[in-house]
């Protein structure tokens, strides 16, 4: 019962049924300001397109990571690698970023601060001088 599958999943033919709940897709579509009237036909097509896209993304991640080895579990890291490697998926970079460890993030912050502080120190000195000049002029 708990044995891994020996064959990859069988492709299902297109049907009039959806796996994603239509009401949830409608709610997500309504959250966009650009969305006008959402007819049942549009809702159905959008849901089917979303399902096909998710299938494509998961299939690409699975194939790239495991090749023809069946029974392996697909993980977040696999999806993020596919998103980061494929130019046509770069719109998902902020939604599916690659995971990094806390110490890596802290190091990135430290480097950004040190690089930013060098630039900011030069700019801040000029701003402070201008502020003190304008304050002395307003006092007179």
Curated annotation (Swiss-Prot):
It is found in: Nucleus. Gene3D superfamilies: Histone, subunit A. Keywords: Nucleus. GO terms for biological process: chromatin remodeling; DNA-templated DNA replication. InterPro entries: CBFA_NFYB_domain, Histone-fold, Transcr_DNA_Rep_Reg. Coiled coil: none annotated. Residues 117-140 have a biased composition (Acidic residues). It holds the Pfam family CBFD_NFYB_HMF. The keyword Nucleus applies. GO terms for cellular component: CHRAC; nucleus. Residues 111-140 are annotated as: Disordered. One of its GO terms (molecular function) is molecular adaptor activity. The keyword Nucleus applies. PANTHER family: CHROMATIN ACCESSIBILITY COMPLEX PROTEIN 1, HISTONE-LIKE TRANSCRIPTION FACTOR CCAAT-RELATED. Component of the chromatin accessibility complex (CHRAC), composed of Chrac-14, Chrac-16, Acf and Iswi. Forms a heterodimer with Chrac-14. The Chrac-14/Chrac-16 heterodimer interacts with Acf (via N-terminus). Stabilizes the interaction between Chrac-14 and Iswi. Histone-like protein which promotes nucleosome sliding of ATP-dependent nucleosome remodeling complexes. Part of the chromatin-accessibility complex (CHRAC) which uses energy/ATP to increase the general accessibility of DNA in chromatin. As a heterodimer with Chrac-14, binds DNA and facilitates nucleosome sliding by Acf. As part of the CHRAC complex, required for oogenesis. This is Chromatin accessibility complex 16kD protein. It comes from Drosophila melanogaster (Fruit fly). The gene is Chrac-16.
